[in-house]
C-alpha cells in the first residue's frame, strides 16, 4: 500500500517586548516552518508515520517516526525537545517565535521557564487510553554526559482533557536536576487561553516561571496571539519578563 503524503507550512511575524533586569530587549522576530508527513496503515490496523520538518534556516526540525495501534504508540526522534513532556505540555505559545533578551543582558542564573530536552536520540511510548480523556506518556534517553540533554534522562506526561479544559502535569528527570510542569488550556469559542507554571530544583536558586498565552483564530489562515512570560529565581535583579504579540 502506498503511503499518504501531506505537506503543510506556516509563517509568523512577531513583536517581542522582552525586558531583562538591566536592559530593554524589544525586537522583531519571525518563524517559518514546513512539514512533510508520510503515513500508512496496514491491513492489520498498525499505523506508521514519519514527519520531517524544515525550519526557516533550512535545518532539520521535528524528525519523528511513530508506530501506533491498539497497544498505544511508540516513536523515536533525533530532536531532543520532542520528548513526552515537551511534545504535549501546555506551552502558552500565543506566538510561535519569541526572542529572549540577549545573553549578555541576563544574569547567568536568570530563569526563563524553558523545559530541557533529554538527548538528541530518544524513544517515547504513549499508553492506550484507559479512561476517556486521560493520556499517559513517557520518554527515555541514554547518553554519557551528566545533564538531561547529554546523559541518562527521562520525562513523563499525564494529560486529562475534559473538553472544557485540558490539564497537563509532568517532569523531566536527569541525574542532577528535575524540571516540573503544570498547565491548563481553556478554549473559549475562537480563542484559547493557556497558563503554565514551570520550575526546577537547580542547586542554589529558587527557579519558577509563569507563562500565559492567548490565541484567537480570525480565520483558517490567520491567528492572532499574545504571550506574557515572567521568570524568577529568588533574586529580584535577575528576574525575567517578556511580552510578545504576533500574527
Label for each model-derived stretch:
Residues 1-247:
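Outer-membrane beta-barrel proteins
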